[in-house]
Amino acid sequence: MNTGLVVFICCVLVAVGVTLHLRKHDMLPIIHKVVDNTTATLVADTVKTKKPVVKRDFNISGSLKDTEGNGVAGVIVSDGFKCVKTDSRGRYKMKRDSLARFIYFSVPAEFEVPTHSATDRTACFYQAVSNKKKIYDFTLRRLPDGKETSYKMIVIGDPQVTNAYSPYYTSPDDNPIKKSDVERFTTQTMADIKQTIKSLPAGTPVYGLSMGDDVQYYGGYNAHLERQIRQALGSSKMRLFSVIGNHDQDGKALYRRKWEDNFGPTDFSFDRGDEHFVCINNCFFYRGKAYYSPGELRERQMRWLKQDLALTPKDKKVVLCYHIPFTFGNAPFGKAKPLGIKSEKGHYSSSRLSQLLALLHQFEGGYELFCGHTHFACNHEIRYEGEDVMEHCHAAACGNIWQSNINICGTPNGYYVYQFIGTRLTDCYYKGTFWDKNKQMTIFKAQTDFNGESYAEDWGLSKDKDKNILVANVFNADSHWRIVAIEDGKEYRMHRISSKGQDAFAAGYHHKYSESVSYRFVSKGNSYLLMNHLYYYVPKNPNARITIKASDPYGHTFTAESTDAVSEPFFNYAHYYEQENQEYKKARNSLLRDSTINRQKDSTQSNNHTKH
């Protein structure tokens, strides 16, 4: 017989025997009860551990009232994903996005810009989102005289303070000292801004706008760096907003969150006078690392922008503010369009530029495009889809990332002062840090050797190098300026250089002194660098004294003399500030005086000793 079959039959007989035994002694019902109870307990335990599904309620509401308790109607309120407007009683309601970090409003033109504190006058127009909070109320303070008809806007490109102490050659004898970037921004840029504000007529409304890259975590992460720069930016009398830059994020959620913790939302708007300012984060990172240039916007940002502009009166001027230029860049997103400009080969316009311009064309007051990022000054003008487009690309307050006092285009560290009257941009000038506001250019001799660099070689002027060719670097110039050389009482239009390339003086200077930034960044090796504010003139008489006259579109004329031409490879205007030079001379003279007095004392004591 099969062994397996025998085993099976034996098992069946045992099972039958056990069952009969249990039935005989009435044990079977007890066994069934135990099994049933055990199963019930297991099921019950399973039910207990399953958490109930809680549906979050993202519906929020609130009100905007003035200090007297009156509702403020028609104000845009947003969560960064959608926009709504307050009703006639100042109330609003919306379903916020689950990813929203802030609820905020677009500051109306008739009201003050709220700030973080009396001593930190950076804008605070938002509340952080809490899952437990359903009501977000805001109180607005009316401007004493209502909406401003005229005001100044100070625009600061790239403060870009780092956690490093960059060597800074501050004295004529090449003795480097180390100052923190925050200290330099505070004691130089902000100190000069305070003087500019002080020089304005009493009662002039002044606002500020940082174009992003407030910080860069070069030299290591510093959890306090964003707060330090916010306090510096907010230390003057102007109320200031900030755009977020690529280095404020560098593709890291921690960095971006730190910026948001200090400045609030990255996509927002506000009104001043008859202008509607829209600030938006156009730093689009590829897989969290490299960023696209020109700047780009995500689809959800375009939806937000369309809603914001749809709720904005069409008689206003729109000033679109962002960090990376939209009209040029050489690290493009796949759908970006080649510019097709021979002198700017390799540059592209943003894939969003057509859509943005279509949105901006709705506004009767026109529009302006404001950006930063480049560390060179450039009013970039292109012919785009049948339209003349200008983008104001602002030079950096930090210049070549605090390695000197100049940007890589030779423009001094500084900031811009705009004036708006109604919907008109009526004035704009560049204010070099610690420079006189009327000094708007520097003059060079084309053949001068700046540490191996020269304008004659860079721009193909070598054939006339014996004629003392003059080069004028006119910091804020564009095609609407008129730049002439006056020789023997006669005016001659200067030739404008507009192409990719370098500024010979800045390249040569930084080649020697820039320790933390590569030479490629400031030289011809930087294919991103566009130079369009250099002008040259070939004198009729190489020995003539020549006056350069630059006239801007706002009615201002600035002059410089050929005798002012920089002829030294490391001219001190980039080396140190005059204020610091005076301090240096004072200290040096004091040391010399003390040394002379000590020598005289030693001589007197020696003579007395000899007599004895």
Positions of predicted regions on the chain:
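Extended active-site neighborhood of metal-dependent phosphoesterases/phosphodiesterases
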Residues: 109-116, 123-132, 219-313, 336-368, ...
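Binuclear metal-dependent phosphoesterase catalytic core
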Residues: 388-477, 481-488, 529-562, 591-592
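A short, amphipathic beta-strand motif
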Residues: 60-66, 90, 138
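Short Pro-Gly-centered beta-turn/loop motif in secreted/extracellular proteins
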Residues: 93-102
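Aromatic sugar-binding surface patches on proteins
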Residues: 502-537
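Short amphipathic beta-strand segments in non-cytosolic proteins
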Residues: 56-57, 63, 68, 74-85
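N-terminal active-site segment of His-dependent metallophosphoesterases
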Residues: 30-59, 97, 112-222
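Short, acidic Ser/Thr/Gly-rich low-complexity loop/linker segments typical of extracellular
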Residues: 75, 81-94, 496-502
